[in-house]
Amino acid sequence: MKKIIALTALFFIGFFFAQEPIKALSKEDIPPEVSKIVDISSLTFIVDTQPSFPGGMAAFRKEFSQNFDTSALEKPKTGILKTVIYYAVEVDGSILQIKAVGESDSFNKEAERALKSIKTKYYPAKVNNLAVRYLLRMPLNMNFK
């Protein structure tokens, strides 16, 4: 039992510190497989205020990691699983149109499922103090040793 707890703690420590900051996207940054899911024509790319999660990114990562089920993954013996999750933050702050792009289908599906299960709404992006749809990108890496 102690080994399971230690491995789980090691996973989450690696998960939290392996992330890159979320950056603003342009239409050119969006992969074709994401363009098929997300209605790009209704997105705003230049905003006055970025969308933000209540409690900040630490609260978002905590909620995401609590929803992430590592037992659903096809785990390699060693190496790194990588995916990039794209998701639209709607004008009401809800998360919709989620697509994970990476090499491992099981990792992509679990990342999408974990994000869909987050019920807390974002504070939406704003232009001229009006809420707008905005696309976020979150890289996700998981190390196996």
Feature names for model-found ranges:
Residues I13-G14:
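N-terminal signal peptide c-region/cleavage motif recognized by signal peptidases
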Residues I5-A6, F17-K145:
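Charge-biased low-complexity segments
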